[in-house]
Amino acid sequence: MDILRFITAGSVDDGKSTLIGRLLYDSGSILADQLEALHSSNRKNDDGTIDLAILTDGLKAEREQGITIDVAYKYFQTEKRKFIIADAPGHIQYTRNMVTGASNSELAIILIDARNGVSEQTIRHSFLVSLLALPHVVVCINKMDMVDYSESVFNEIKAAYLQIAEKLNLKEVTFIPVSALKGDNIVNESQAMPWYEGQSLLHYLETVAVVPEHPFEHGRMPVQWVIRPQTDALHDYRGYAGRMVSGSLKVNDDVVVQPSGFQTSISRIEFAEQTLEKADKGMSVTLHLKDDVDVSRGDMLVAISNQPLRSKNIVADFCWMDSRPLDTSVMYLLQHHSKQIRCKVQEICYKVNISNLEEHAATDFKLNDIGRVVIKTSDPVTFDQYEQNPSNGGAILIDPRTNLTVAALLFRQAVDL
């Protein structure tokens, strides 16, 4: 059974928590103790029905404040598919949380309040979806019950959003009119909107293709651990453990060790105490090489037929995630897979004004700012362009003074400075 990872995003009070709660409740994905807590809760909607948003409450402190201040994950499954939901906060100051939640998602659900239409947060969330190249977008126009299930309201919002989607080059966009409070078109098709002839949200989620139309097929395995037991029984054992981030590698395949450039071939593949002929994307394996070449943690084993980019100067889209602004005089740590490299922001190309999607010159980056920069590293980085291979096209920036993650980077190209 395959897994669909998706994120929900919307402005404050657009009904994300209620939508997720309705999805879990109506699909029968609630455990007995959760159901009991739900029915015994004093939290009710204005019409006296159960407040399904309770099902997505996170930490106690978050519940007491009445907001969700981190990315909350929920898991459920139907007969057709397993699902992992990332619930991102709607507040503008939590844009970084949306980046975190969307980075591992394959689909985004963007909620729009039917009474308010497209908001600045709608544009911001859609821009992030475009930036992270999520292949599918579902626009749920929520609270249709509050506008008398009006087809004209739905069509007006749809037309307004399509203009944004065209600017952002969002190609796979589906629109569903819903009422999370009443349950219309969440799991079951709505009887109140006979003019809508599409699928319910759950039916769409169960049937949408999760395999990329043109997957990146070239093998990449960052080395996380060099295994040398140093025992009498395993004196000559030398394996390289890591997770396949793209493509596949087979026994006897020729590979290159990056960044050193040494060439060798694979002699054996181990997986969970078994010997395999092939390692595919997502598998954590141990590779053995035919030649005794120098391989260290942080190096990458790549298929010889297709080499990644390798550079000390990288153009990257950039989301600043720290309360302290960017300091271009500081040497930050670039974390790319298991490798840390010293680096600095060499140039700020531009920042994006989210309200109108225009690029403008800038001299600094503050919390939740998004734009493009040039990174200069102390050692070469082995990477692919994010749009071609997201699994090998992103990194984070760490401030060595605080050990905090301060930025997310999406690699776009190598440059000569």
Where does each model-flagged region fall?
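P-loop NTPase switch module centered on the Walker A-proximal segment
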Residues: 1-93, 105
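Helix-rich terminal scaffold detector
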Residues: 2-25, 41-44, 111-112, 138, ...
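C-terminal effector modules of nucleic-acid-centric enzymes and ribosome-associated factors
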Residues: 5-8, 146-149, 153, 163, ...
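Residue-level signature of catalytic and energy-coupling elements of molecular machines
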Residues: 13, 19, 38, 66, ...
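Conserved nucleotide-binding/hydrolysis micro-motifs of P-loop NTPases
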Residues: 14, 25-26, 91-92, 115-119, ...
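Conserved Switch II/interswitch segment of TRAFAC-class P-loop GTPases
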Residues: 81-83, 88-94, 102-126, 130-155
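Conserved catalytic-core segments of large NTP-driven translation/proteostasis enzymes
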Residues: 155, 162-324
